[in-house]
Amino acid sequence: MSYDKVSQAKSIIIGTKQTVKALKRGSVKEVVVAKDADPILTSSVVSLAEDQGISVSMVESMKKLGKACGIEVGAAAVAIIL
């Protein structure tokens, strides 16, 4: 499951804005996006990742994604870094 990938990853970037920046730098291996996040926020992340041929995984909950990242709040998007 993608929550496990995030919690076991050595290096991650949390949040949509930071994920977009990392995608533009070309340092992203995979993107994980929460289905319950606002599509207005996550659509740019998903489209940019797909344009670059980067795998996009969808998870059910922002809260669980945030917990997998080790933070107390939800996370809409997370980038797993190369």
Curated annotation (Swiss-Prot):
Pfam families reported in the protein's UniProt record: Ribosomal_L7Ae
Protein keywords: Cytoplasm, Ribonucleoprotein, Ribosomal protein, RNA-binding
Top-rank taxon: Bacteria
InterPro entries recorded: Ribosomal_eL30-like_sf (IPR029064), Ribosomal_eL8/eL30/eS12/Gad45 (IPR004038), RNA_bf_YbxF-like (IPR023460)
Function of the protein: RNA-binding protein that recognizes the K-turn motif present in ribosomal RNA, but also in box C/D and box C'/D' sRNAs.
Self-association state and partner proteins as the record states: Found associated with the 50S subunit of the ribosome during exponential growth but not during stationary phase.
HAMAP family hit by this protein: Ribosomal_eL8_Bact (MF_00574)
Name the UniProt record assigns to this protein: RNA-binding protein YbxF
Native organism: Bacillus subtilis (strain 168)
Gene name tied to this protein: rulS
